[in-house]
Every structure is written in structure tokens, then in C-alpha cells.
Swiss-Prot record:
Endpoints of the signal sequence: none
The species this protein was found in: Bdellovibrio bacteriovorus (strain ATCC 15356 / DSM 50701 / NCIMB 9529 / HD100)
Gene behind this protein: rpsD2
GO CC list: small ribosomal subunit
Annotated CDD domains: S4 (cd00165)
Family, per entry: Belongs to the universal ribosomal protein uS4 family.
Keywords: Ribonucleoprotein, Ribosomal protein, RNA-binding, rRNA-binding
Protein's name in the database: Small ribosomal subunit protein uS4B
Gene3D superfamilies, A to Z: Ribosomal Protein S4 Delta 41, Chain A, domain 1, RNA-binding S4 domain
One of the Pfam families matching this protein, by short name: Ribosomal_S4
Function comment: One of the primary rRNA binding proteins, it binds directly to 16S rRNA where it nucleates assembly of the body of the 30S subunit.
Length: 208
């Protein structure tokens, strides 16, 4: 990716002072570990609203969702039996097909994984699925079409995985081709960066 292509993603991560692996290449905070427009590590003052906004933006930007998409998942999470709806939200976010493809190491970012899915390169239990928002179930098998194992997106991710394989997934090599499964339900610990669930709850409790 060229410098222009990565700059907006890096700026968003710098503004949040958090590396968001789903956005792609690492290193957003390496050279300038402070927000755009700020010179050096000055102490920032936050309002409660600003803290809440930043925490929910971390999740939304990492998983690459528009606000309306994010809210739909929140509404679904709130209807679950979970005592903490943010945990139910994370469960849904982590089980989206585009994220599962990313976490299995088949793509180096969620946008790249979404592209594989939308181009019809991903199979769920042997059937093509081209909807990145599809929720994967425990036990589902995720593979790629034969030609996709030579795809540049897959090859780049295999050579330099963005994240280690999470504990709730498994992967094996079958006849020289990787396949993965969701083996357990993801919980809050599945999120690959630090965030405060209570602040996310606070943000949406004031906004319906």
C-alpha cells in the first residue's frame, strides 16, 4: 500500500492513540505516538463524552463499520440474554465472516478480507458466501476457492500475519491448503486491543 493509502488509517489510529489491527499495516504509532496536530507527548484533557466517543470509535474503526451498521449490531446485542450487551456485541463482531477471514490469517486487514469475501473467494462449509456481514457459527469450516490460495491478498497475509490465531479458532493444512474453524464463542478478550466496555455502554445509553 502506498503512503497516501495508509495515511488516513494511520491518522485515525494516532488520534485514538491505539493500534487497530483490523485497519491493516502495523506501525501507526511508531514514529508519532500522539494525535495529528499535536507536537510531542503533551497531556490531553478529556471530557467524559470524548472518552466515551473514542472507545466506541476504536471498535467501529477496527471492524470497519459505518455508524448505522454498528448501531444495528448494538440493537441486536441488546436483545441477547447476555448480562453485558457489549460482550454480546463483541461476540457478533468477531463472528462476522470478514473478521473471521482476517483472524484466520487469510488476509492482513478486515478490508482486504471483505474484498476476498465480496469477490466470491471464500467458502463456508464448502459453499460460496459473498456477504462479509454473515455471522459464522461454532463448527463452521472456512476455506478459500482453490485459485484464491494463490491470491496476492492471501499470500501477503500468510507471509506476515497481522495477528496470532485467537484461542477460539483453529486452523489446519489439508492437502497444502489452509482451512479454519470457529471452535468457541468469542468474548470481550477477543478484541485485539485495550478498550473500556463501560465507556461504550455510557456513550449509547445517552443516545438510545
Amino acid at each position: 500500500m502506498n503512503r497516501q493509502g495508509k495515511t488516513p488509517r494511520f491518522k485515525r489510529q494516532r488520534r485514538l492513540l491505539t493500534e487497530l489491527p483490523g485497519m491493516g499495516k502495523a506501525g501507526a504509532l511508531e514514529r508519532r505516538p500522539y494525535p495529528p496536530g499535536q507536537h510531542g507527548l503533551q497531556r490531553r484533557k478529556y471530557s467524559e463524552f470524548a472518552l466515551q466517543l473514542e472507545e466506541k470509535q476504536k471498535l467501529r474503526f477496527h471492524y470497519g463499520l459505518r455508524e448505522e451498521q454498528f448501531r444495528r449490531l448494538i440493537n441486536k446485542a441488546k436483545k441477547s440474554k447476555a448480562t453485558n450487551w457489549v460482550e454480546a456485541l463483541v461476540n457478533l463482531l468477531e463472528k462476522r465472516l470478514d473478521n473471521v477471514v482476517f483472524r484466520l490469517g487469510f488476509a492482513s486487514s478486515i478490508p482486504a478480507a471483505r474484498q476476498l469475501v465480496s469477490h466470491g473467494k471464500v467458502l463456508v462449509n464448502g459453499k460460496k458466501v459473498n456477504i462479509g456481514s454473515q455471522i459464522i457459527k461454532v463448527g463452521d469450516k472456512i476455506t478459500l476457492k482453490d485459485e484464491a490460495y494463490q491470491n496476492q491478498v492471501y499470500m501477503a497475509a500468510k507471509q506476515a500475519p497481522r495477528l496470532p490465531l485467537p484461542s477460539f479458532m483453529a486452523k489446519e493444512d489439508v492437502a497444502g491448503k489452509e482451512q479454519g474453524r470457529l471452535t468457541d464463542e468469542p468474548n470481550l478478550e477477543a478484541v485485539p486491543f485495550a478498550f473500556e466496555p463501560g465507556l461504550v455502554i455510557g456513550y449509547y445509553s445517552m443516545r438510545g
